[in-house]
Amino acid sequence: MAQKLYAGAKLRELRVKLGLTQKVFAERLGASLPYLNQMENNHRPVSATVVLALAQEFGVDVTKLTTSEAERIVTDMREALADPVFTDSPPLADLRLVASNAPAFARAFLDLHRAYRQTHERLASLDEALGRDEADLRPSPWEEVRDFFHYCDNYLDAVDRAAEHYAAPGGVRRDVFSAAMETLTRAGLDLQISDMPAIRSREGNALRLSARAAAPTQRFQLLHQVALLTQNDLLEATLDLARFQTAEAREIAKIGLANYFAGAALLPYRPFLQAAAETRHDLERLADLFGASIEQVAHRLSTLQRPGAKGVPFFFVRVDQAGTITKRHSATRFQFARFGGACPLWNVHRAFETPGRFLRQLAQTPDGVRYLLLARDVSKPGGSFTAPVRRYAIGLGCEVQHADALVYADGLDLKGSFEPIGISCRICDRQECHQRSVPPLEKRLRVDPDRRGLLPYEIVD
């Protein structure tokens, strides 16, 4: 049965933006006034007739009415409310109600909790902020940019289509390296491959790329420069819509947008989507076909969410050797902890032990959703004996209902047992987890001095 669509907040926001009364809005939607009122308050789902009217009458992208954003807000609120500062956590139904009916309030709450957490961390570490007259309680520029990409599903339609038009006009791929060289020539820039530690450097009329960087990295950096040269107006317009609070966040986001363009040009949407389906998402074959790295391919797969031409919904993550998440994107219901690392039961942590191999895992999260997870180590050599080697592990996953579209599902028992994993120990209520680091803050604990199990306490429902 199709899931009912509740989008009251978005209906109300659209009506207010258009300056229409409920009566006029209802008439243009072909709905009665009481029914519109019920839909705006999420007492009734949005009917198919209303969805069609929104598209035809107001040009609304109906894919924006889905609840994926609300689900991410609920996940973030659950994690925030697991903080010890809160005695009790509201029921999940209440959180879903807030996320659906008052998303702006929910985001304000998350901003407030983030400000509190930053203040608490400053006090705990006695850092330099204690000496300031005013502590900056706003999110850090990096966090602000991270949340921007997080809440747009890591898919930016205008930038993605511009990159596809550049790399595959008319849907036919062209040699992006040659195209990029033509762009540089028209801009009066000369490309130089130099032996230098910096990956990319522009000095005057010379664009220098490091000879120590791998070929996919060089191509990516070249296309990054193309984005800055040819898409500046588009990037600036996108930044204007984002309304970042600081100049630093805007500058970081512009780099992120140029990187997005580079990845989308290296792996243009329609040709890459078709190749992914034909190869059954074989990352190594896709990397060879497009001259990209495995990490670039995995990252791109997580962005294939164009309305009307969506790919398999993946999540993508990259962790360092300490387990810290350094990249995270999700087009699935799977969400990552905003603070700390990933669940230690996840196979991404074991990828460092098996270099050069893909690890497969069938896993189930506490909400009952089952996933096929892939993990592999990736190394980024420094290009010389004395240069440090950066080592990471990447994880890619999709819900098991899409597993047949992946070559990595072959030979796995998709109806068999699934390993339990979570998001963060603080919001995971699994009782028999041998890797738990802290107790779940939404549960009561029982401590028996005469008995010791896996944990020094018992989790009580």
Curated annotation (Swiss-Prot):
Q: SUPFAM superfamilies, from UniProt? A: lambda repressor-like DNA-binding domains
Pfam families from the UniProt entry: HTH_3, Peptidase_M78, ScfRs
Record function comment: Transcriptional regulator that controls propionyl-CoA assimilation through the methylmalonyl-CoA pathway via regulation of pccB expression.
Task: Print the keywords alphabetically.
Answer: DNA-binding, Transcription, Transcription regulation
What name is this protein filed under? Propionyl-CoA carboxylase regulator
Deletion phenotype, per the entry, is: Mutant is unable to grow with propionate-HCO(3)(-) as the carbon source. However, the mutant can grow normally with succinate or acetate as the carbon source.
* Single GO MF annotation: DNA-binding transcription factor activity
InterPro entries recorded for this chain?
Bact_TransReg_Diox (IPR050807), Cro/C1-type_HTH (IPR001387), HTH_RamB (IPR026281), IrrE_HExxH (IPR010359), Lambda_DNA-bd_dom_sf (IPR010982), ScfR_C (IPR018653)
**Source domain of life:** Bacteria
